[in-house]
């Protein structure tokens, strides 16, 4: 009998992903309650969502907060004070950092949280956790909340109109769910059934992304709202979040995310989104594990999707030893999840993996 206690939080209480999804707000909240809502959003996000917002957004009494900070203790305290008393619900409109902040604010105020993602770069709208930062914007830790998000409202047309780099990053980050989960749970038959369900979901999502992403990206380029596009969006927002919710620590992060963290020490990589760097990290993980078949499959897919297959595409020179040494040192820190890999890790083995990826031909 397995003795691996885990906490399962499959997902939000309500998830709607279709044109007109915002109207569901009125199915769960009265006008009186929505007149006491706190809306928090970023400048670009609210501009992108403006034409789709429900009438509730303009109700007298609703609080509107334009947010430009981080999910930091001081910013959340300030937002709580600005929200005022007698509020009914927190509604966050934006990307991952904004939604993390709004989630934390909702818990601070003891209110239900409604997520309105305007990009599909992460599963932040789905997951009941926030990444905390200091006031300088440096990541500190993440907090898993005691309750699920109340509602997620995905309006596909808003995401269709977003810059394509965000969808690409979401594809990269969500592909990692499968490739990292199989490292974290090499013997799933010994683990709780929910972990196995999470792994099965990760595999299904991987297949959707490998089979449909090229078409979805083309459809976005042509401004066509299609089944392929909606499937990829749901795979990122709902599927990615569900995997972690079912499997807990057995379906979260391994080497791909550690490589991402290592790359962040180089300032030139800051311009690249989280999921874009994670996608590259999957290639390095595959090289470390000697999985040439996976490396070939993903390199071919990335070239079709326009995800990076080399450090050069992330503006990092493989021959700059000082920079590569910094990346390796950070990636191999004792706290990093790369150490879940069932292989011996040294600076030399990691350097060899980077070089293998750099010269690999699909």
Swiss-Prot record:
Pfam families, sorted: Fe-ADH (PF00465)
EC number(s) reported in the record: 1.1.1.-
Summary of the knockout phenotype: Cells lacking this gene show a consistent change in 2-hydroxyglutarate level.
Keyword Metal-binding: yes
InterPro entries: ADH_Fe/GldA (IPR001670), ADH_Fe_CS (IPR018211), Glycerol_DH (IPR016205)
Residues involved in Zn(2+) binding: 173, 257, 274
Cofactor, how bound (note): Binds 1 zinc ion per subunit.
Gene Ontology MF terms: 2-hydroxyglutarate dehydrogenase activity; identical protein binding; metal ion binding; oxidoreductase activity, acting on the CH-OH group of donors, NAD or NADP as acceptor
Catalytic reactions of this protein: 2-hydroxybutanoate + NADP(+) = 2-oxobutanoate + NADPH + H(+); 2-hydroxyglutarate + NADP(+) = 2-oxoglutarate + NADPH + H(+)
Listed cofactors: Zn(2+)
Keywords, in A-Z order: Metal-binding, NADP, Oxidoreductase, Zinc
Task performed by this protein: Catalyzes the NADPH-dependent reduction of 2-oxoglutarate and 2-oxobutanoate, leading to the respective 2-hydroxycarboxylate. Cannot use NADH instead of NADPH as a redox partner. Do not catalyze the reverse reactions.
Family affiliation: Belongs to the iron-containing alcohol dehydrogenase family.
Protein name: Hydroxycarboxylate dehydrogenase A
Annotated source species: Escherichia coli (strain K12)
UniProt gene name: hcxA
């Amino acid at each position: 009998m397995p003795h691996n206690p885990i906490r399962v939080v499959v997902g939000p209480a309500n998830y709607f992903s279709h044109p007109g999804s915002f109207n569901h707000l009125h199915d769960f909240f009265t006008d009186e309650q929505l007149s006491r809502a706190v809306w928090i959003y970023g400048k670009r996000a609210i501009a992108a969502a403006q034409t789709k917002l429900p009438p509730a957004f303009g109700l007298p009494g609703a609080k509107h907060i334009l947010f430009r900070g981080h999910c930091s203790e001081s910013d959340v305290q300030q937002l709580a004070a600005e929200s005022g008393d007698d509020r009914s619900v927190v509604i966050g409109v934006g990307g991952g950092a904004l939604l993390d902040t709004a989630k934390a604010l909702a818990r601070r105020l003891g209110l239900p949280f409604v997520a309105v993602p305007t990009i599909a770069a992460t599963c932040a709208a789905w997951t009941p956790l926030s990444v905390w930062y200091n006031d300088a914007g440096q990541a500190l830790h993440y907090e898993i909340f005691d309750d699920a998000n109340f509602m997620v409202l995905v309006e596909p047309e808003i995401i269709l109109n977003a810059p394509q780099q965000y969808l690409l990053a979401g594809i990269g980050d969500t592909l990692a769910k499968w490739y990292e989960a199989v490292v974290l749970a090499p013997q799933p038959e010994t683990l709780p059934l929910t972990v196995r369900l999470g792994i099965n979901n990760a595999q299904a999502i991987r297949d959707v992304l490998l089979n449909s992403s090229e078409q979805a990206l083309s459809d976005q380029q042509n401004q066509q709202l299609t089944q392929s596009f909606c499937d990829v969006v749901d795979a990122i927002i709902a599927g990615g979040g569900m995997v972690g919710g079912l499997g807990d620590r057995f379906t979260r992060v391994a080497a791909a995310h550690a490589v991402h963290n290592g790359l962040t020490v180089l300032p030139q990589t800051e311009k690249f989104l989280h999921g874009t760097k994670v996608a590259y990290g999957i290639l390095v993980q595959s090289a470390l594990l000697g999985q040439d078949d996976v490396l070939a499959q993903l390199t071919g897919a990335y070239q079709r999707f326009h995800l990076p297959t080399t450090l050069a595409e992330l503006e990092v020179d493989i021959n700059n030893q000082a920079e590569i040494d910094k990346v390796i040192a950070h990636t191999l820190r004792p706290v990093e999840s790369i150490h879940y890999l069932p292989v011996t890790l040294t600076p030399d083995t990691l350097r060899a993996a980077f070089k293998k990826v750099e010269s690999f031909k699909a």
